[in-house]
Amino acid sequence: MVPPVETKAMSKQNHPARWTLWTTVFCSFLLALFTPQLSRAQYKADHIPGFAGLESGTQAPPGIYVGDLVWIYPTSTIKDNDGNKVGNGSASLTSSLDVILGSVVTNYKIFGANYGTQVALPFIKNEIQLNSLDVSSSFAFSDMIVSPVVLGWHLKQADVMAGYNLYIPTGQFSATGTGNTGLGMWGNELTLGSTVHLDKTHSWNAAANFGLEFHSSKKDEDIKVGDIGTIEGGLSKTFYKKVSGPIPMITNVGLAGYSQFKITGDSGSDIPLFLQGYKDRVFALGPEINTFIPKPRLTLLFRYEPEFAARNRAQGQTILFSIAWVAKSLAKHP
C-alpha cells in the first residue's frame, strides 16, 4: 500500500499529465466534431469510376486509336457510415480531369483473343485525396495509366475482355499537401468484363466490367489504401443509319451505371483513429449516348451518372465527354 502522504504527492505530480491527457481527448473530440468533411471518409484509390459504361466488355476492332476524355465531378456531400450527410453542406468542390488516350488493338492472338495495349495521360484539377472537400490545386499532370495487356474475345452472342492496368505515381504528391495532383502510390488492377448480345442482330446489349485494384504504401507515409472493387456497365440499344459508304453510322443509347467499394480496409500506422475500421462504397446510374461517325472515323460520347447510397465518401455527379479517332484501321476484311 502507498502511504497517504506519498499518494498526495504523486497526485500532485501527475495532475499536469492528467490535464494533458484530458485536453488531448477533448481536442480530439472537437476535431472530429468540427471537421465533418473528413469524418470517416476513406482514402481514394486510382480507379475513377464512370470511365466505362455501355458495352464495357467489348474490345474495339483492330486499329490504332487516339482520343480525349473530359471528366467532371461536382459534389457538396460527404456521407458517413450510416449514409447520413456530414456537415451542413455549405462546402462544395468540382474535380475535373482531361485524359489523352492512345491505344492499339492488334490482330495478334493470345489464347484466341486479340492483343491490345493502351496508355492514358491525365491532367487533373482538384484531385480528391481523402474524400475531403478541402482541396485546391491547379490543372496539372496526374498519375499515368498504362495497360500493357488488354485481351478481347468476340463470340457469337457475347464479347469478353480481360486486362491489366498499372497506375504510375507521376503526379505531384506531398503527405501534408492539399494541392496534390497524384495519390503518391503505385496501383495494380486486374479487369474482366463481358458484353452479352441479347438478340441475334446485336441491337440489345448488356455489359459489365469488374476491376480489382490493389496498391503500394503511400509515399512518405505508413498508409496503404485497401483493395478496391469497381463494377461498370450498362444496358443499351444500338441503332444503325445508312450513310454514304459501306459502314453505317452506329448509335448506342442506354442506361449506364457503376459501383465502387472497398474490399479490405485501409491499413498503416499513419491512418487517423477515426478513419480506421471503415470501408466506403458508392453507386451511380444514368444515361449514356455514343455515336460512331464513319467518314471522319470519330466516336463521340456523353455519359451522366448521379451517385447514390454512398458510405464514408463523397457523393456527387459523374459527367463525362469523350472523342476518339480511328487513326488507322488494322481490321482484316475477307
Label each region the model flagged.
Residues G50, K79, K85-V86, D220-P334:
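Outer membrane beta-barrel transmembrane domains
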Residues S56, D68, V99-T106, V146-L151, ...:
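Residues on the lipid-exposed face of transmembrane beta-strands in outer-membrane beta-barrel proteins
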Residues Y43-K44, Y73-L97, N131-S137:
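Surface-exposed strand-loop-strand hairpins of Gram-negative outer-membrane beta-barrel proteins
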Residues A113-G116, P122-G226, Q276-D280, P294:
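Outer-membrane pore/translocation modules
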Residues V66-P74, T117-F123, A162-I168, A208-F214, ...:
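Transmembrane beta-barrel strands of outer-membrane/channel proteins
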Residues F34-A41:
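Sec/Tat signal peptide C-region and signal peptidase I cleavage site
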Residues P62, S92-I100, V135-I145, G182-N188, ...:
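Residues that define the transmembrane beta-barrel architecture of outer-membrane proteins
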Residues E55-G63, N107-G116, W153-V160, L198-W204, ...:
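Short loop/turn motifs that connect adjacent beta-strands in outer-membrane beta-barrel proteins
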